[in-house]
Amino acid sequence: CKKDGEESEDVNLPELVIGVDYYAPVVYHDDDGNFVGLDVELAEKVCKIIGYKPKFVRINWSMKNAVLMRGEIDCIWCCFTMTGIENEYDWTEPYMNIRQVVAVKEDSSIGSIDDLNDKRIAVQSSTKPDDVLSGRAGVRMIVPKLKSLNCFTDISYMFAAINEGYVDAVAGHELVLREYMKTSSVKLRILPEALLDVQVGVAFLKRMHPETIKRINQAFYLLKHNGYMANLVSSYGLDPNDYVVDYEKTK
């Protein structure tokens, strides 16, 4: 029988159907149409440990709750912010720390979060920046009084909006914005002050998968302490000291 920490052979294993959206470098397609990215690698590694075969399904992020409720997916695993909505799902332990940040054009006069007052900002709909800037984030903070909050179903439209000058700023996960900035024809810079510091986890429907959550948490703990998580985030150019969760501090 398999000992804890050993990886299962990917033969006749039960599927874990994972809902994702395109969110490079976390989840995206390679040239052959395969799902790749930080969260994909982590999910595949965890599933090998706990005895599941991962099946990644792209979902409309704004419809994620409905898809989960209908049973079309087992969980949502795509850099999903748990901060402020801890009671809406059954969550795993957090596996990564993330900053929600704001990016502006390099020559913009905007230098801080306070400077966003009376400005136009773009976000992906149903994300944490959408919740924060619309005042429904579930966390206490002073929200800028925007001229407009423009919500897009696809993150690529958000970037197109700032490129074309339709908005003054965009907000999202720092690692996602930085990935876009690598290839953007328009030079952007990230404001030094974070919009919100958050943690991400894997979300399941309440009271449906307690044993799976327990086993994923055990795998997270193992991968943190054997160095896998640090090596994984480092391979994406991220500092493990900033991104890897210290589980001792979460207890």
Model feature map: region roles:
Residues 13-37:
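Short glycine-rich His-centered loop
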